[in-house]
From Swiss-Prot:
Residues annotated to bind NADPH: G67, S69, G71, R92, K96, D123, L124
Reactions catalysed: sphinganine + NADP(+) = 3-oxosphinganine + NADPH + H(+)
Subcellular location as annotated: Endoplasmic reticulum membrane
The keyword Lipid metabolism is assigned to this record: yes
Protein role: Catalyzes the reduction of 3'-oxosphinganine (3-ketodihydrosphingosine/KDS) to sphinganine (dihydrosphingosine/DHS), the second step of de novo sphingolipid biosynthesis.
UniProt-annotated catalytic positions: S205, Y219, K223
Cellular compartments per GO CC: endoplasmic reticulum membrane
Residues of the signal peptide: none
Keyword vocabulary terms for this entry: Endoplasmic reticulum, Lipid metabolism, Membrane, NADP, Nucleotide-binding, Oxidoreductase, Sphingolipid metabolism, Transmembrane, Transmembrane helix
Gene that specifies this protein: TSC10
Name of the protein: 3-ketodihydrosphingosine reductase TSC10
Species in which this protein is naturally found: Yarrowia lipolytica (strain CLIB 122 / E 150) (Yeast)
Record bears the keyword Transmembrane helix: yes
Amino acid sequence: MIFPISEIPDKVTHSILEGVSALQNMSHTAFWSTVLGFLVVARIAVILATPKRRVLDIKGKKVVISGGSQGAGAALAELCYTKGANVVIVSRTVSKLEAQVQKIVTKHEPVFEGQTIRYISADLTKEEEAIRVFSEETMPAPPDVIFSCAGAAETGFILDFKASQLARAFSTNYLSALFFVHAGTTRMAKEPISPKNPRYVAIFSSVLAFYPLLGYGQYCASKAAVRSLIDSLRVEALPFNIRVVGVFPGNFQSEGFEEENKSKPEITRQIEGPSQAISAEECAKIVFAQMEKGGQMITTDLIGWILQSIALSSSPRSFSLLQIPLAIFMCIFSPVWNAFVNRDVRKYFHANTEYVTRHQRGGVGSENPTPQ
């Protein structure tokens, strides 16, 4: 209900008018200092009011990992097993799954009697396969933690790929995550547990979801879709006591990383600069350590955290008192950086005319036509 201003008590009216007058007389510097001070105090109040996060304890819990036969998924499987989890790894290739399970059980003793690690072979780009993984027949008890790690990057220029290759990239990176997480979260929601023990769904996207890079066009688009999935599911899962975590790794050593480097355009290497890839094991340790601290938007290096500040959106912040001012700075700096990148790209294609000439003639690339 809205009251006419004449009905507001005189003292209140006088106070409001005084406040407006004070704002009008305040200098721009003083005004923005006041606003910034208010925001800082408000953020500190939110931090103090936030309940203390519980440590993620997976001993005796069921952890299901897609892409668990190699790369970060395999490293997470080994790490979780050493922490006492009952691990299930999921991938398509049975031979790789068997080798990974054998490697882990040979290398590590069980943390407790009866601890298990097993595999399920499934093509997660198919909805029915993802549903089978989490069915009661395949998995009698629901998972406590899910890691969605499956994915692959195929480098090159978008115009050089056939439509079938573009669709394959989206299927490999987005649909596999969507179907796997949808089936797993649905199973979790069906069988709720105590609010004191939240379940976890950690979904791997990429730092390139924040800042697309020439030569990774189709990969960036699919990983940006995964980032939107993370933000959407994070809110939808709240009523079921499921904590959704987004993981945005930079480069890490894996079979996939070696493959993507084989077709990476030279201009992409120039823009990237010297980027040291961490090991898959180090990536897994960083991700798990951040989850233990309650992190919901996890990056694996400083560059990733900086790039995240360009695309904060409605996602949870990481070290927000530092990240918000950084975001303001990056809004100013990014156009300058883009100007230098665009200059380098024009110089590259001026010197390498085959790509432009081919497409001006209406040619569509072969399986890997991108100039090196």
